[in-house]
Amino acid sequence: MHANSLDTFYSTEAGQLGFYINQVPYFYYEPAKPIGATYFNLANTTDLAQVDILYAHQDMAPELAQLAVASGAQGLIFAGMGAGGISSVAREAASALFNATGVPMVSSHRSADGFVPSGSGFTVASGFYNPQKARVLLQLALTMEYGLEQIREVFALSYPMA
């Protein structure tokens, strides 16, 4: 029970944000920066980098990634099956393209919800980001001229804490 709370029966474990006394809120913790928050200064930017989304499927044409890069894509998002999977033939072609050009490629999931874990080789894992959100994040990172490791770090900010 609590002497100052209208809801007298509650759990006393951590998790509450604070309490009210005389209609004034008192917080237990200072505001925290949200997980995954990255600041991009776009003050002098008029255009974002071109990033294309390729929807993966069985028998995906392996030349799609090469055609996207040839038409000006500076980064690619693979909207993969399950947790970001693409066919082995398309993966081999994308890997060869990455080795030849260094164009960043992000593995995402096309399902409504889910997570793409890190450790998928040459691609950057999108974590919880769907293809549309991953595209915007990659556009921002490329516009700020982030390198591959910086891009990996930006996406890793959305991963759950281990």
Model regions and ranges:
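C-terminal non-catalytic interaction/assembly regions of soluble proteins
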Residues: 67, 80-162
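Accessory alpha-helical/coil subdomains and C-terminal extensions
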Residues: 1-75, 81-83
